């Protein structure tokens, strides 16, 4: 949608691949890169500002991830946080260990990246996982392996109501009207 570039992912090979394909439209850009899922239309602008601000934190994190605590976390990837509050990893629900499934803090999908480091992070994503896909969430562990800080911002679950059906759309519309 003008003035923004649109990029189509030719094959559905995972969220990491979708971002890899989109990077061509960002050639030469070095500012913050915000990655959001189209199925989450209720994320507030204030939340996105907090996500971008977290990327400017004391350790200048390479990535800031949006997190939330749903009533039923069983369908979501988990944010693995160290004792010092640093984000260590994002683990997809189907790849989580029994211990990780006990974590209530879940991946909300949105991420803010350092534009100078995003290409290196995306290029390092592999597809050795339960779905043989390129998971965008792997970038957190990749960044940590490089010694780069990662952060998270927790938001309300009502901002992350996934819209994947007409029923979901009706529910999200009602929530938006109630705001």
Tell where the protein language model's regions lie, with residue ranges.
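Generic low-polarity alpha-helical segments
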Residues: 1, 6-7, 26, 30, ...
